[in-house]
């Protein structure tokens, strides 16, 4: 009987040994949770080879410093002095996983610990630290970032896992909240060749801000002021009333306070919005609530202060043009803009009707005043002061409305003066003189408004129908345009064509700079900018043509001056494409053009327009209002929606 019992015990022991040694290298997580099976020397050797391939040291490959005996030594109680067994049982998988993670995060230090016999004790210490639920996620994040710093051989195509996935796998395997289960899942992914997507802990962002900009807690007022200056916020960053973001962005950044003990792998990592939300455990579906926004703020501050995202190169723009395409498309767009000057010929299409040309020219003259003043106040002034950048930040266009109030004040006095002249009793001689108001009693036969009016006699003396050619019609309606002996003009009116041409030339040069810079960026930006320039150049050039005609120039002279000033846009275009023009230089050019426009419109065009006499004053008053309000409306819409023109 005794021999039979001994035989049964021997068979049972043999079965157990065979079971322990013959277990296949299953997943470490399933091996840990089942508590059955073991890892033999072959499986451990393969695991150690994988670990050696996944890390690199500061001076190159780390080399293989861990042996199978070191791994088997993890299966004996610390200080037992017993030799390692032939296999590593399932109950020691948690310690093996912790020890492997230590090697992946710090290969040099782990090799020294293994030689000193401290590898197992340090693995137990790591497991003890991660057992706290509050320390598990931050601890894993710290380990993964160290592993990323030491990782070798990773490619962008490798499947990456993050901490939430590791936690879910541990829960699914029946080890919720277990540090050993999470580390075993991590080691399974190491064996399968996965990479790891680590994220910093929420506290890291707060610590970064305080370590870099505060010598103590809480942060002092001076330190907060320095922090706000670096971020470009606060009163000092917006000291001038124009809120010029261009100046704030060009200011040299305040250097970070160097701290040797606060450096981290995360200091140079640029995080996406999804990464930031994941770091704080926020769901993409739920979004960011006001309460969560307060938590996210340190992360955004850290990204701004560290400059991690500023050094990354931008991806190539798909719609960028080649150098030859920039010149081709830019030249075509500028040519179309220059053809606006030729549209002045439209004024001659209605000369078949007596008196119509006079009112057409007066309408376009008022349109020129509205377009030029609107362009200077609503369009160019915001660009000069850098106020157009506010539209990119989602702010309300409040500066535009304030500038519109300036034009409203101008329009109020315009109405007051016109209504005052219309409602008061008029001199009978004004009615007899006709639409031009040429009275023999007014300054030698010419009033101050003579340049902006047509001769009265020609409007009252029609020519026979058989003499109605276009040239005759122009001469009939406005003989001073074709007469080789022009009428006598006042000195200020003789200067008006040159001032209009000079202002147009400077403005068109600046437009060419803008078009060239836009096409250098992309064809979409170039097309949008060209359309915007065309919108405000069309009424502007038509009005200028009318003003030049009324200043005593012939049709040919007015067209030549308009075309000459428009051609400067090509010079600006080629300068921008060839050498490039900075935003600051363009602002100075536009500032000079703004002053020229305001002087021409308010000191020359508007006073002369107000002194026009006509037998139908209310009709002329209506046409002047249509021109003024039309020009201002076009430029107001352009100023409000110019940045929204996209294709």
UniProtKB/Swiss-Prot annotation:
<feature type="signal peptide">
    <location>
        <begin position="1"/>
        <end position="22"/>
    </location>
</feature>
<feature type="disulfide bond">
    <location>
        <begin position="160"/>
        <end position="195"/>
    </location>
</feature>
<dbReference type="GO" id="GO:0031410">
    <property type="term" value="C:cytoplasmic vesicle"/>
</dbReference>
<dbReference type="Pfam" id="PF18292">
    <property type="entry name" value="ZIP4_domain"/>
</dbReference>
<feature type="site" description="Essential role in Zn(2+) sensing">
    <location>
        <position position="511"/>
    </location>
</feature>
<feature type="binding site" description="M2 metal binding site">
    <location>
        <position position="508"/>
    </location>
    <ligand>
        <name>Zn(2+) 2</name>
    </ligand>
</feature>
<feature type="transmembrane region" description="Helical; Name=6">
    <location>
        <begin position="559"/>
        <end position="579"/>
    </location>
</feature>
<comment type="subunit">
    <text>Homodimer; homodimerization is mediated by the transmembrane domain.</text>
</comment>
<keyword id="KW-1003">Cell membrane</keyword>
<feature type="compositionally biased region" description="Basic and acidic residues">
    <location>
        <begin position="460"/>
        <end position="470"/>
    </location>
</feature>
<keyword id="KW-0813">Transport</keyword>
<comment type="similarity">
    <text>Belongs to the ZIP transporter (TC 2.A.5) family.</text>
</comment>
<dbReference type="GO" id="GO:0071577">
    <property type="term" value="P:zinc ion transmembrane transport"/>
</dbReference>
<dbReference type="GO" id="GO:0055038">
    <property type="term" value="C:recycling endosome membrane"/>
</dbReference>
<dbReference type="GO" id="GO:0016324">
    <property type="term" value="C:apical plasma membrane"/>
</dbReference>
<feature type="topological domain" description="Cytoplasmic">
    <location>
        <begin position="554"/>
        <end position="558"/>
    </location>
</feature>
<keyword id="KW-0864">Zinc transport</keyword>
<dbReference type="Pfam" id="PF02535">
    <property type="entry name" value="Zip"/>
</dbReference>
<feature type="short sequence motif" description="Essential for SLC39A4 endocytosis">
    <location>
        <begin position="452"/>
        <end position="454"/>
    </location>
</feature>
<dbReference type="InterPro" id="IPR050799">
    <property type="entry name" value="ZIP_Transporter"/>
</dbReference>
<dbReference type="Pfam" id="PF21116">
    <property type="entry name" value="EF-hand_Zip"/>
</dbReference>
<comment type="function">
    <text>Selective transporter that mediates the uptake of Zn(2+). Plays an essential role for dietary zinc uptake from small intestine. The Zn(2+) uniporter activity is regulated by zinc availability. Also exhibits polyspecific binding and transport of Cu(2+), Cd(2+) and possibly Ni(2+) but at higher concentrations.</text>
</comment>
<dbReference type="GO" id="GO:0046872">
    <property type="term" value="F:metal ion binding"/>
</dbReference>
<feature type="glycosylation site" description="N-linked (GlcNAc...) asparagine">
    <location>
        <position position="261"/>
    </location>
</feature>
<dbReference type="GO" id="GO:0034224">
    <property type="term" value="P:cellular response to zinc ion starvation"/>
</dbReference>
<dbReference type="InterPro" id="IPR049406">
    <property type="entry name" value="ZIP4_12_EF-hand"/>
</dbReference>
<feature type="topological domain" description="Extracellular">
    <location>
        <begin position="580"/>
        <end position="586"/>
    </location>
</feature>
<feature type="binding site" description="M2 metal binding site">
    <location>
        <position position="511"/>
    </location>
    <ligand>
        <name>Zn(2+) 2</name>
    </ligand>
</feature>
<dbReference type="InterPro" id="IPR003689">
    <property type="entry name" value="ZIP"/>
</dbReference>
<feature type="topological domain" description="Cytoplasmic">
    <location>
        <begin position="608"/>
        <end position="617"/>
    </location>
</feature>
<feature type="topological domain" description="Extracellular">
    <location>
        <begin position="23"/>
        <end position="327"/>
    </location>
</feature>
<feature type="binding site" description="M1 metal binding site">
    <location>
        <position position="536"/>
    </location>
    <ligand>
        <name>Zn(2+) 1</name>
    </ligand>
</feature>
<dbReference type="GO" id="GO:0005385">
    <property type="term" value="F:zinc ion transmembrane transporter activity"/>
</dbReference>
<keyword id="KW-1133">Transmembrane helix</keyword>
<feature type="transmembrane region" description="Helical; Name=2">
    <location>
        <begin position="360"/>
        <end position="380"/>
    </location>
</feature>
<keyword id="KW-0472">Membrane</keyword>
<keyword id="KW-1015">Disulfide bond</keyword>
<feature type="binding site" description="M1 metal binding site">
    <location>
        <position position="511"/>
    </location>
    <ligand>
        <name>Zn(2+) 1</name>
    </ligand>
</feature>
<feature type="transmembrane region" description="Helical; Name=4">
    <location>
        <begin position="499"/>
        <end position="518"/>
    </location>
</feature>
<feature type="transmembrane region" description="Helical; Name=3">
    <location>
        <begin position="403"/>
        <end position="423"/>
    </location>
</feature>
<dbReference type="GO" id="GO:0140410">
    <property type="term" value="F:monoatomic cation:bicarbonate symporter activity"/>
</dbReference>
<feature type="binding site" description="M1 metal binding site">
    <location>
        <position position="540"/>
    </location>
    <ligand>
        <name>Zn(2+) 1</name>
    </ligand>
</feature>
């Amino acid at each position: 009987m005794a021999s039979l019992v001994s035989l049964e015990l021997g068979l049972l022991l043999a079965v157990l040994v065979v079971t322990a040694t013959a277990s296949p290298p299953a997943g470490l997580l399933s091996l840990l949770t089942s508590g059955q099976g073991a890892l033999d020397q072959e499986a451990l050797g393969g695991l150690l080879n994988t670990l050696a391939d996944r890390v690199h040291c500061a001076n190159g490959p780390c080399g293989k410093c861990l042996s199978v005996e070191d791994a088997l030594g993890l299966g004996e109680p610390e200080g037992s002095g017993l030799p390692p067994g032939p296999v590593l049982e399932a109950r020691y998988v948690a310690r093996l996983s912790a020890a492997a993670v230590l090697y992946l995060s710090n290969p040099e230090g782990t090799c020294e610990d293994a030689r000193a016999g401290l590898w197992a004790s340090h693995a137990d210490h790591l497991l003890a630290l991660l057992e706290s639920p509050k320390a598990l996620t931050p601890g894993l994040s710290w380990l993964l970032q160290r592993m990323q710093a030491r990782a070798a051989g990773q490619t962008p195509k490798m499947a990456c896992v993050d901490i939430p996935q590791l936690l879910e796998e541990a829960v699914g395997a029946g080890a919720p909240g277990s540090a050993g289960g999470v580390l075993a899942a991590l080691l399974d992914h190491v064996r399968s060749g996965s990479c790891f997507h680590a994220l910093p802990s929420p506290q890291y962002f707060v610590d970064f801000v305080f370590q870099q900009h505060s010598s103590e807690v809480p942060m002092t007022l001076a330190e907060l002021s320095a922090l706000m200056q670096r971020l470009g916020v606060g009163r000092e960053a917006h000291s001038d009333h124009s809120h010029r973001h261009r100046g704030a962005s060009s200011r040299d950044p305040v250097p970070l306070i160097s701290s040797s003990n606060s450096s981290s792998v995360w200091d140079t990592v640029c995080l996406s919005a999804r990464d930031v939300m994941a770091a704080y455990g926020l769901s993409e579906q739920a979004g960011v609530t006001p309460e969560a926004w307060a938590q996210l703020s340190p992360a955004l501050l850290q990204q701004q202060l560290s400059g991690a995202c500023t050094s990354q190169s931008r991806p190539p723009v798909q719609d960028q043009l080649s150098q030859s395409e920039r010149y081709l498309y830019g030249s075509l767009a500028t040519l179309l803009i220059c053809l606006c000057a030729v549209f002045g010929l439209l004024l001659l299409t209605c000369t078949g009707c007596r008196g119509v040309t006079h009112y057409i020219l007066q309408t376009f003259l008022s349109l020129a005043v509205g377009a030029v003043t609107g362009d200077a106040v609503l369009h160019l002034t915001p660009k000069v002061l850098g106020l157009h950048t506010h539209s990119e930040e989602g702010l309300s266009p409040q500066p535009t409305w304030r500038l519109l109030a300036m034009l409203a004040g101008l329009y109020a006095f315009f109405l007051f003066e016109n209504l005052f002249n219309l409602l008061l009793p008029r001199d009978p001689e004004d009615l007899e003189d006709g639409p031009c108001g040429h009275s023999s009693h007014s300054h030698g036969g010419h009033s101050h408004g003579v340049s902006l009016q047509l001769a009265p006699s020609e409007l009252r003396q029609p020519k026979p129908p058989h003499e109605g050619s276009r040239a005759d019609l122009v001469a009939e309606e406005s003989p001073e345009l074709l007469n080789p002996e022009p009428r006598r003009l006042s000195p200020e009116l003789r200067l008006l064509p040159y001032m209009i041409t000079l202002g147009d030339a400077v403005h068109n040069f600046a437009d060419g700079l803008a078009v060239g810079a836009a096409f250098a960026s992309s064809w979409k930006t170039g097309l949008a900018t060209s359309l915007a320039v065309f919108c405000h150049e069309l009424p502007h050039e038509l009005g200028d043509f009318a003003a030049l005609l009324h200043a005593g120039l012939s049709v040919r002279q007015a067209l030549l001056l308009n075309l000459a000033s428009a051609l400067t846009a090509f010079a600006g275009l080629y300068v921008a494409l060839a050498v490039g023009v900075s935003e600051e230089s363009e602002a100075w050019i536009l500032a000079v053009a703004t002053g020229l426009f305001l002087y021409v419109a308010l000191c020359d065009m508007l006073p002369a327009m107000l002194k026009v006499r006509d037998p139908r004053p209310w009709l002329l008053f209506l046409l002047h209002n249509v021109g003024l309000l039309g020009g201002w409306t076009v430029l107001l819409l352009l100023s409000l929606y110019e940045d929204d023109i996209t294709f």
